[in-house]
Every structure is written in structure tokens, then in C-alpha cells.
């Protein structure tokens, strides 16, 4: 990649600012999933091995008012990171000022500091989220070099990524490098055949991705709630299934443009209610009863998608095939997950979000070449958009 990577920087005795993505789920002040912290370890450990001083920062959730601060402190993250690294992580409960500056000045080579949630700066005028130039300059003044390892926020131009990068020599961390290699590779130079599997509820969320991938992929398999808008566009009866009526014309246009590249489900698991307790059965995709709704793809579609995947050299999957939170309607997502996991000769990529969660919950995480850490960022990358957080990293 043409962007600098952390290994291109001289880190010895340097104060290294690191934008990590520690936006982890919390419940009652406890971290419920530390995947994102674990994902940042290679970059942090490399900086420490090189005798750099690691100054870490991240956002956590949305913070708009003083009340929002409750439960949004990164203090529990510092404690967990300390356990994972096997060394003390100094926590500074502020985002600017003398306390932070003193802690940074006193940091020794090979030591780690984490300062408070960058979005605490959003309470007074959205300084972080609107990329306030003074804030970016201030944070940049705390370090000698900047490493951006937060792919999850790469689609946003914030003070903590773009703002700092415009004031300091910067490089991608190992996680960011991996994301650019795999997600970027799908868009720029995939091994063929490239098969994309897109799920999720709304066509509107995935229009850009479908349009872009129809020009890149050899096949695009569509599942999830958005299939019903496509079926309606073909004149099929979809009962009470999810429909974006204002997107039917658009779906028609996509179907015409796609020809046989776009593959839709041939059956659906339907029920009268959006519930795990209601009776359910499988019907052909063109005969969904008027009083029922499709909540998953059926076995015939799983078999069809499995067949379409055979021989693929690159597979990218984004979005579940049904309401996978309800066990009765999770079989489609599990089936697709298994089909991709069983491909031995392909680069297999999950584009973050719900599909990543599904693969991890099902124990398939190690069967994929790459599971993206960024939901929105992956989607925008797959749409072919330039990501500000990536664009702002120094070129080699």
C-alpha cells in the first residue's frame, strides 16, 4: 500500500500518538467483549518493543451532554489493556490540559498511557466529531509521530484522526494496514471469481455497495430483509415482509443492470409474527402468504448460495441472511457462514457489523481470512468511497 505503516517510522525515544478503536460494548461499567482491545495489541506491542512511548486514545459511544459521560469513561478499558499487555497502563481522566501534558512529559520509553474518551470533547461544540482544527493541532502537539490504527472510524473526519494527521507525520497501524489490504483488495484488485454476499434489512443501507460491487464482482448473492424489495420489484407477492416502497424503482433498475449477476433467494422461512414463539414454515419465494412475513432464507437458497460459492477465489460477506438474533430464523446465516468457512482455496472476508458478530458467536472466526473491525467504514470502502481516516495518513 502507498501509505506509511508503523514499521516505516523511527519510534525510538519518540512520543507516539496512537488512535485506537476501543469503542467496546459495556454493561454496568464492565466490558462485555474485548475483541477491539485485543485487535490493537500488535501495534501497541511493536511501539513498546521499539522503545517508543505509547499515548493511546479512542472514542467510546456517543457523548452529547454531561449526562452522557456516565458509563462512557475509558478507565475500565485501561484496566483490561493492562491485563492483556501484562504491564501498567497509566490512565489520564481528561482529554486536554496540564494533567494530561504532565503525564505525557513524564512517560518513559516503553510505557503506555491512555487518555479519556475523545468524544468528551463533543459536549462543548462537537470539537472531536467536527474535526475542530485547534483540537487536532493541540493533540498533535503532545506527540512526535502519529499512528492511526482505528479503521472503525476511518470513514469519519474527526480531530482524533484527520485533525492530528494534518499536523504530524503519520502511519497506519497493523490493524489499519490489514483492513486496507483485505477490504481495499476486494475493491481494487480481487482474485477472481469474486462473489459478494449481501444481507441486512434495508436496501437503502446497501445501495452504494450493491451498485459498486455489481461492477466488480462476478456474482452478488442477496439475502436478508432487503430481498423483499427486490422481489416486489419483480412483481412477486411478499405478504407482510419488510418492504421499502420508495426503493422499488431503484431495485428494478439494479436488477436490469445486473442481469444474471444478482442472485436472489428461491425460498423463505415465513411466520405470522416477528417472534421466536410463533409457528414458522418454508415456502417458495414467489408464494409468500398474504398474512405472513419472510424472516430468513430457506434450505433451497442455502444450497443455491453454497453452489454459487464453489470455485470462488475471493468472497466478501456483509449482513445476515435473516433475523439471526431469533434462533428459528438464524439457519440461513449459519448456513452461509458454514459454506464460506468450508471454502479452502479462497480469500474470505467479513465486512464487519452483524455478520462479524454472527461468525464469532458461531465459532467460525478462525475460518475466515479476515473479519473487519469496521461496520460503517467497511461498507463505505466497499462502495468505492475514499475514507478520510485512510486518505490523511502520510504517503510513503
Swiss-Prot record:
Name of the protein described by the UniProt record: Phosphoglycerate kinase
Biological processes annotated in GO: gluconeogenesis; glycolytic process
Main location: cytoplasm
Catalytic activity: (2R)-3-phosphoglycerate + ATP = (2R)-3-phospho-glyceroyl phosphate + ADP
Annotated residues for binding of substrate: 21-23, 36, 59-62, 119, 156
Family under the similarity heading: Belongs to the phosphoglycerate kinase family.
Binding-site list for ATP: 206, 294, 325, 352-355
Pathway membership, UniProt: Carbohydrate degradation; glycolysis; pyruvate from D-glyceraldehyde 3-phosphate: step 2/5
EC number: 2.7.2.3
Gene Ontology CC annotations of this record: cytosol
Example of a GO MF term: phosphoglycerate kinase activity
Amino acid at each position: 500500500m502507498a501509505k506509511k505503516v508503523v514499521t516505516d517510522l523511527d519510534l525510538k525515544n519518540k512520543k507516539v500518538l496512537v488512535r485506537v478503536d476501543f469503542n467496546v460494548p459495556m454493561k454496568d461499567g464492565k466490558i462485555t467483549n474485548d475483541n477491539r482491545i485485543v485487535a490493537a495489541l500488535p501495534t501497541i506491542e511493536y511501539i513498546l518493543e521499539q522503545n517508543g512511548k505509547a499515548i493511546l486514545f479512542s472514542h467510546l459511544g456517543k457523548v452529547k451532554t454531561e449526562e452522557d459521560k456516565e458509563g462512557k469513561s475509558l478507565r475500565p478499558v485501561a484496566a483490561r489493556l493492562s491485563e492483556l499487555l501484562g504491564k501498567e497502563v497509566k490512565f489520564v481522566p481528561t482529554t486536554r490540559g496540564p494533567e494530561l501534558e504532565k503525564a505525557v512529559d513524564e512517560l518513559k520509553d516503553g510505557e503506555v498511557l491512555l487518555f479519556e474518551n475523545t468524544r468528551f470533547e463533543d459536549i462543548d461544540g462537537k470539537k472531536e466529531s467536527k474535526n475542530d482544527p485547534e483540537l487536532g493541532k493541540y493533540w498533535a502537539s503532545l506527540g512526535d509521530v502519529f499512528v492511526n490504527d482505528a479503521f472503525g472510524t476511518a470513514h469519519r473526519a474527526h480531530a482524533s484522526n484527520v485533525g492530528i494527521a494534518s499536523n504530524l507525520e503519520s502511519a497506519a497501524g497493523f490493524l489499519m494496514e490489514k483492513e486496507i489490504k483485505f477490504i481495499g483488495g476486494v475493491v481494487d484488485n480481487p482474485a477472481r471469481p469474486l462473489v459478494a454476499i449481501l444481507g441486512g434489512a434495508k436496501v437503502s443501507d446497501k445501495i452504494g455497495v450493491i451498485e459498486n460491487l455489481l461492477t466488480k464482482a462476478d456474482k452478488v448473492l442477496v439475502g436478508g430483509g432487503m430481498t423483499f424489495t427486490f422481489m416486489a420489484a419483480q412483481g412477486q407477492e411478499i405478504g407482510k415482509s419488510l418492504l421499502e416502497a420508495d426503493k422499488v424503482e431503484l431495485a428494478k433498475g439494479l436488477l436490469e443492470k445486473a442481469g444474471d449477476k444478482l442472485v436472489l433467494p428461491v425460498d423463505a422461512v415465513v411466520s405470522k409474527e416477528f417472534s421466536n414463539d410463533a409457528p414458522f414454515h418454508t415456502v417458495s419465494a414467489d408464494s409468500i402468504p398474504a398474512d405472513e412475513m419472510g424472516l430468513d432464507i430457506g434450505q433451497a437458497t442455502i444450497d443455491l448460495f453454497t453452489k454459487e460459492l464453489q470455485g470462488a477465489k475471493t468472497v466478501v460477506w456483509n449482513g445476515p441472511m435473516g433475523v439471526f438474533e431469533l434462533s428459528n430464523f438464524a439457519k440461513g446465516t449459519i448456513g452461509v457462514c458454514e459454506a464460506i468457512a468450508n471454502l479452502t482455496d479462497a480469500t474470505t472476508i467479513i465486512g464487519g457489523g452483524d455478520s462479524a458478530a454472527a461468525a464469532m458467536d458461531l465459532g467460525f472466526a478462525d475460518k475466515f481470512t479476515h473479519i473487519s473491525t469496521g461496520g460503517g467504514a467497511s461498507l463505505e470502502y466497499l462502495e468505492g468511497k475514499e475514507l478520510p481516516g485512510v486518505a490523511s495518513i502520510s504517503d510513503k
